[in-house]
């Protein structure tokens, strides 16, 4: 894949420009992946493979993938590795986690992103970003909805959180949000239950 080849080439260099280009390529790849995921979810042949998944493994992979954004925006990452495991589909769960982390980075200009594991089997991702207005919160999981922040930043596709909710529904997990304008957002994925649900 050309995008992957370019990313590997750029990672061999350590400069501000290479990190910026790597970040831009990652975002292009994310948009492509969102479209493909949207199409897969609409297919009757979507397969889910449930097994014991180590959250630290998935988190580590996504943190490494997004490290260029952390570096470019000079944001702190607060995360203590955990040995927590859940029963889920690793590929689909990884997509959800990447989307949430990517959103946290996108809408946080200073401060930090904090990743923690709460009981029972709940992944919590918090940021010190611009937050979501109370009137937008009930609609952020709707397809195509970008809200005020999305319109202002012109970075939102209106698909990311919609896909996260759809995937979590299919996995039998639950996704929730708490946010305050000017203080940040906390997203939680509750994975104490799982179930392959066909639509």
Tell where the protein language model's regions lie, with residue ranges:
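Short beta-strand/loop element within the Bergerat-fold HATPase_c
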Residues: 112-122
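Short conserved segment of the HATPase_c
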Residues: 132-145
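Glycine-rich ATP-lid/hinge loop adjacent to the conserved G-boxes
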Residues: 145-155
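A conserved beta-strand-to-alpha-helix junction within the catalytic ATP-binding
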Residues: 49-67
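Short helix-loop "hinge" at the ATP-lid/N-box region of the Bergerat-fold HATPase_c
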Residues: 104-105
């Amino acid at each position: 894949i050309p995008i992957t080849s370019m990313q590997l080439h750029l990672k061999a260099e350590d400069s501000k420009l290479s990190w910026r280009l790597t970040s831009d390529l990652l975002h292009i790849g994310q948009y492509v992946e969102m479209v493909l995921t949207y199409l897969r979810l609409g297919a009757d042949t979507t397969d889910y493979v449930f097994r014991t998944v180590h959250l630290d493994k998935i988190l580590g992979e996504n943190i490494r993938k997004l490290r260029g954004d952390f570096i470019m925006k000079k944001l702190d990452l607060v995360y203590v590795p955990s040995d927590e495991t859940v029963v889920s589909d690793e590929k689909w769960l990884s997509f959800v986690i990447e989307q949430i982390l990517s959103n946290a980075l996108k809408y946080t200009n200073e401060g930090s992103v904090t990743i923690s594991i709460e009981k029972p089997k709940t992944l919590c991702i918090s940021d010190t970003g611009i937050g979501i207005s109370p009137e937008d919160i009930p609609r952020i999981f709707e397809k195509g909805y970008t809200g005020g922040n999305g319109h202002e930043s012109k970075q939102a596709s209106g698909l990311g959180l919609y896909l996260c909710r759809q995937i979590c529904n299919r996995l039998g997990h639950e996704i929730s949000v708490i946010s305050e304008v000017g203080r940040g957002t906390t997203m939680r994925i509750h994975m104490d239950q799982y179930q392959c649900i066909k639509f």
